[in-house]
Amino acid sequence: QGPPISIDLSLELLRKMIEIEKQEKEKQQAANNRLLLDTI
C-alpha cells in the first residue's frame, strides 16, 4: 500500500508548485503590463 500513496503525494505537490508558479508568472506579467502602461 505504501508506494502509490507517496507517488500520489509527489504528483499533488508537483501540481501545486506548477499552479503557484503559473500564478506568480501571471502576477509578474500583470505588473510588467502596468509598468508598460505607465511609461507610455
Swiss-Prot record:
Family the entry assigns: Belongs to the sauvagine/corticotropin-releasing factor/urotensin I family.
Pfam families, per database record: CRF
A GO cellular-component term linked to this record: extracellular region
GO molecular function: hormone activity
Chief location: secreted
InterPro entries according to UniProt: Corticotropin-releasing_fac_CS, CRF, Urocortin_CRF
Subcellular location as annotated: Secreted
Residues with the Pyrrolidone carboxylic acid modification: 1
Isoleucine amide: residues carrying this PTM: 40
Annotated Gene3D superfamilies: 6.10.250.1920
Function summary: Hypotensive and diuretic peptide.
The protein's name: Sauvagin
Keywords, comma-separated and alphabetical: Amidation, Hormone, Pyrrolidone carboxylic acid, Secreted
